[in-house]
Amino acid sequence: MNTSDPPAVLRIAAITLLCTASESVEQNPLIPFENAVLGSYAKMASEKRCDGWMAKCPDRDDCCETFHCTRFNARGN
């Protein structure tokens, strides 16, 4: 393909623009809402697995703060 060809350059620019736009988080206005809903669900699931939010943890880094049990807070450990 000859890149000095104006239609080819325009096609490449259009594809690049579309790919960049599709990867941008700001393009979808529903993402903050989805994150809020799914984040609340993940927090509740984490609390259930870990015997409560921030339960029985030596420090904040060992808690279920990232929505998964750590080696210090998992049941059965």
UniProtKB/Swiss-Prot annotation:
First and last residue of the signal peptide? 1-21
Could you name the Gene Ontology cellular component terms for this entry? extracellular region
Name the principal localization, coarsely classed. Answer: secreted
Specify the superkingdom.
Eukaryota
The record's account of tissue expression is: Expressed by the venom gland.
Provide the alphabetized UniProt keywords.
Disulfide bond, Ion channel impairing toxin, Knottin, Secreted, Signal, Toxin
- Give the coiled coil ranges: none
Q: Which GO terms describe its molecular function?
A: ion channel regulator activity; toxin activity
Where's it found, cell-wise? Answer: Secreted
Q: Which residues form the propeptide?
A: 22-49
The answer to whether keyword Disulfide bond applies is yes
What is the role of the protein in this entry?
Probable ion channel inhibitor.
> What does the comment on domains in this protein's record state?
The presence of a 'disulfide through disulfide knot' structurally defines this protein as a knottin. Is missing the last conserved cysteine.
State the similarity comment.
Answer: Belongs to the neurotoxin 10 (Hwtx-1) family. 65 (Jztx-21) subfamily.
What is the designated name of this protein? Answer: U14-theraphotoxin-Cg1c
